[in-house]
Amino acid sequence: MNKPSTRAKSAPAAAKASASLQEPASGFSYSRPFFEELVDRALAHAKRLGATDAGAEASEGCGLSVSVRKGELENVERNRDKSLGVTVYIGHRRGNASTSDFSDKAIEQTVQAAYDIARFTAEDPMAGLPDADDIAPPDTHRDLDLFHPWAIDSEQAARLAMECEAAALKTSRRITNSEGAGVSAQQSHFFSAHTRGFRGGYASSRHSFSVSPIASLPGRNAEMQRDAWYSSERDAAELASPEAVGRYAAQRALSRLGSRKIATTQCPVLFESTLAAGLLGGFVQAVSGGSLYRKSSFLLDSLGKMVFPKHIDILEDPFVLRGKGSSPFDEEGVRVAPRKVVRGGRVQGY
C-alpha cells in the first residue's frame, strides 16, 4: 500500500562514501570518532588479556513512538539507548558480553567478562572471525541512502495517527471500533571492528505508521473482525498517506466479514502478498547459516536441489537504495554482493 517509489535507478559508485559515515549525525549523542575510539579501546584490552581474536560494536538508537485510540492520545514514548558489545575468542572458544556504560572501567569489565566466558566455554570448531581476504575494505562500503532523520514532534505524530485512524473509521458504517493507530520515527548508528582488519559502520532510519480497525455485522450473532495495515520506509517522505493506510486497513477488516472455513481438500491456493512474503521468510530462515549449523532446518543439504517450481528465481540484493534489509557488508564485515539464491527452482546458495 506504500506509494510508488521515487528512488534513483542507478546505484552510486562502490567507492562513494556516505556523509553519515564521516560526520556525527543529527539527533545522536555520540559521534562516529567517539565510537571508533571506544571500540579500539575494547579490542586493545582484549588482546592484552590474551585473546586470540576479538570484535566489538558500539551503537546508539533514539526515536519517538506515539499511539492513539478512538481519537484520543494513548501513549507517547521517547527512547534513547546505547550499547557496547564485545566478542572474545580464545582459539575456538567464544565469549560475549555487553554494557550500556561507556566508562573506561565498564569497558574493561565487559571485555573481562567476555574473556572469562570464553575461557570456560566448550570449543566450537566453527567459532571464529572471517578470513582477512573475505573482509569488505572501507573503500567498498557503498552509500545506500539508509539515513533519513524525521524531524517530527509528539503533537505532529499524534495528528498523523489520528488522521490514519479517522480514515479507517470513515470507510464504512461497518467499521465500528479501532484497536488504535500509531506513528514511529526511529534512527540509529553503529561502528564495528575486529582484529582481522574490518572497520565500518553507518547510520540508518526507519519510520512507520499503522492502524488496526474492527469491522462488525449487526444481528443476533454479531460478527467482529479486525485487521491492520501499515507503511514503513527509511525516508518518511516515501510513506503512504495516512488516509490511504487507514482506508486499506478498513477494507482488509471488511473483507473478513462473512468468511467461512472450507472442508479439507487438495486444490490450488492463491496467497495474498503479505502471506506470500511470509512463505518466503520461512525459506530464508531455513537456508540461513544458523539453522543449517544447528541442523534444525528442513532444507539441510538442499544445495542444487529443486525446492520451488521452475519459474521461481530468488535474488538477494544487499545494495537496494533505502532498502529495509540493505547493507554494504554483513554482520561480520564480510563483502556482500547481489546473487541468485534460487535459480529455476533450485537452491544456488545459502
Enumerate the language-model features and the residues they cover.
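Active-site bordering "gate/hinge" segments
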Residues: 1-337, 343-346
